[in-house]
Amino acid sequence: MASLGVQLVGYILGLLGLLGTSIAMLLPNWRTSSYVGASIVTAVGFSKGLWMECATHSTGITQCDIYSTLLGLPADIQAAQAMMVTSSAMSSLACIISVVGMRCTVFCQDSRAKDRVAVVGGVFFILGGILGFIPVAWNLHGILRDFYSPLVPDSMKFEIGEALYLGIISALFSLVAGVILCFSCSPQGNRTNYYDGYQAQPLATRSSPRSAQQPKAKSEFNSYSLTGYV
């Protein structure tokens, strides 16, 4: 039988992973302006996300513009959008499925069926974590490649934004949650314990009354025959 505490820990991590992935997907600071070289003194700082880009002035005013078209964006941005949306959908579905398979709920009272449902929820968490980790790692690689490339001008270089750190942590939470839910159930162990108890109980109840009744019957018969002839 799966441990209730382990399942709760896995489910909470999955919820945190879903929340972090959704926030990281919407944040506009996947890439932030790099203040190196000639661009160390500038009046405007830029940040780019999956859905919008923002400009922060030296006065503290920030202006954000949503991308006017999605089809005109670079291929890596489009792929990141699709994978992050799919990751959030997978994690949301995993949260719903895992609720049915957890021991603290009243759904699906059969313990074996609950274990199977919990494993399915864990698999969806793992898929959501993988889909959320790929675009984050992809953008992280592109930022580091352009930053250390001598062919890219200093004004075109960006640094790692806070959204990427949040995306990495959220993806790891989803992966760990899926692994916990998948390995917290052991159907084979439950099956062996169930059959062992079922076979041992009838043998104990049937053998003990017979052994106790046979000597008693012999003693009654012997006493009856002796008193009758005397």
Curated annotation (Swiss-Prot):
Changing D65N: Markedly decreases cation permeability. Disruption phenotype: Both female and male Cldn2-knockout mice are similarly hypercalciuric compared to wild-type littermates. Cldn2-null mice are hypercalciuric due to a primary defect in renal tubule calcium transport and develop papillary nephrocalcinosis. Cldn2-null mice are also found to have increased net intestinal calcium absorption, but reduced paracellular calcium permeability in the colon, suggesting reduced intestinal calcium secretion. Cldn2-knockout mice have decreased bile flow and show increased susceptibility to cholesterol gallstone formation. It comes from Mus musculus. The channel permeability is down-regulated at acidic pH. The disulfide bond is necessary for pore formation, but is not required for correct protein trafficking. The record marks D65 as: Paracellular cation selectivity. Expressed in the kidney, liver and intestine, with higher levels in the ileum than in the jejunum. Low levels in the brain. Expressed in colonic epithelium (at protein level). Expressed in the perivenous regions, bile ducts, and gallbladder epithelium (at protein level). This is Claudin-2. Induction: Induced by IL22 upon C.rodentium infection. By CDX1 and CDX2. Induction by CDX2, but not CDX1, is potentiated by TCF1.
